[in-house]
Amino acid sequence: MSIEKEKFWASHKQVVKEIGGTNLINGKHDLFKAVAYTSDDIEAVESQFGVPIMGLQFHPEMSMYSNAFTCSEKGRDKKIYLSFQQSVWSFHNKQVLLAEFKNSKHYSKTQHPTEDITEKLINYENNKYNNNIIDIFNETSVEIIGYSNVEILN
């Protein structure tokens, strides 16, 4: 989510001075990125990978000015909360789907789901394309997002 540079009301002094202990196992990237600062503190962080995580240490719903509830500020505030709501629903749906998968008869902790599937060759008119997906695609009239006769260039 992108919010233009703006002044927010931050009335608390319990703030993060630095981000630490968030490296991924491979040590190449930090999980969190600081996205809002004051002159001496980090005020907000966002996760860069995996589940969306946002940490706010200010009041995004309140401006530091008396005209805190202008239309543009209300729109900005709504975007923040809608983004949060969308993240909550996405995480919930992922958990439901994962539970359904784990409880299905096709899931096995000891066997990969595709181990018992044998590979089958594609037969198109006596296999004139030699199972080459690029040849099959180029010889077939297709429609992708409103474009017809799309070609893959080698």
Swiss-Prot record:
One of its GO terms (molecular function) is transferase activity. PROSITE patterns: GATASE_TYPE_1. Disulfide bonds: none annotated. Residues 1-94 form the Glutamine amidotransferase type-1 domain. Keywords: Glutamine amidotransferase, Transferase. The keyword Oxidoreductase does not apply. The keyword Transcription does not apply. Gene3D superfamilies: 3.40.50.880. This is Putative glutamine amidotransferase-like protein RP712. The lineage of its organism: Bacteria, Pseudomonadati, Pseudomonadota, Alphaproteobacteria, Rickettsiales.
